[in-house]
Design a protein with these regions (language model features):
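Short, low-complexity, intrinsically disordered N-terminal peptides in bacterial proteins
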Residues: 1-3, 167, 171, 234-235
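Short, charged N-terminal helix-start/capping segments
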Residues: 1-17, 113-128
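Core catalytic region of metal-dependent phosphoesterases/phosphodiesterases
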Residues: 2-7, 12-106
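N-terminal short leaders/motifs
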Residues: 44-67, 146-149, 159-187
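Active-site-proximal loop/helix segment associated with metal-binding centers of metalloenzymes
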Residues: 116-176
Length: 235
């Protein structure tokens, strides 16, 4: 059985070495993996509208489509920088893109995965923003704007929220993460995988926090026997 691979936040922003390295990594997965889960925030901002694709995004999206044609399942966890991605890309670049987590049953394990941006129940400002920015009325008004205005608006709104998010992630909130993951483990899952925090952690062999890929060049690998380990990403 080929591996199941979880990839943490990548935050690709433009053409360059990081983009080329990531595309090469995805290409290598065709020979080693059967399933890929992207844990959200693949780009600095990803909007579910094909007419807003920037060149670097188009190249990654084309590579994901290629992986699916090769027979790999590609699943996506919408993160705090993703806006209705599933509506535009499920069926082409992605198999699915659930907003509230997904379950992978692999190697005899039930693995629950979710981006993790809602782990901090005390961050009410962010929770309010998340609901507002993804609501149907806001999305409808946003779609009515010309593409350039839409991109400029998203960039400004994201910049205004970075301070709150940065404060929360300045130090890894281990107890918050443990409590958050415990709720999913209590449902009968064997392991929980989170992105969002940009650090690599394996807590008690059951809770795995994915490193930010662009800096670490590492990912979480699940073998056919259910063994879970962080490994260097081949290029």
């Amino acid at each position: 059985m080929s591996d199941l691979v979880f990839i943490g936040d990548v935050h690709l922003e433009m053409e360059g070495p990081d983009l080329e390295a990531f595309l090469a990594f995805l290409d290598r997965l065709k020979g080693t993996a059967s399933r890929v889960v992207l844990a959200g925030d693949l780009f600095n901002v990803w909007i579910g509208a094909r007419d807003l694709e920037r060149p670097h995004q188009a190249r990654v999206i084309a590579k994901l489509e290629e992986l699916r044609r090769h027979g790999l399942a590609v699943r996506y966890l919408e993160g705090n920088r993703d806006y209705r991605v599933g509506r535009a890309y499920v069926g082409t670049a992605l198999d699915d893109a659930p907003a509230h987590g997904l379950v992978e049953r692999f190697g005899g394990r039930s693995i629950f995965a979710i981006h993790g941006d809602l782990a901090n129940s005390a961050d009410r400002q962010y929770r309010t923003w998340r609901r507002f920015s993804r609501s149907a009325p806001v999305w409808g008004a946003f779609r009515a704007l010309p593409p350039r205005s839409r991109l400029a608006l998203v960039d400004r709104l994201e910049a205004s929220m970075r301070a709150s998010n940065a404060r929360f992630k300045a130090a890894f909130p281990e107890e918050v993460v443990r409590r958050y993951a415990a709720g999913f483990l209590a449902r009968g899952h064997d392991a929980v995988v989170l992105g969002h925090f940009h650090v690599e952690r394996a807590l008690d062999g059951r809770v795995f926090v994915l490193p930010e890929w662009k800096q670490s060049r590492r990912h979480l690998q699940v073998g056919g026997d259910g063994a879970m380990a962080f490994v260097d990403s081949p290029a």
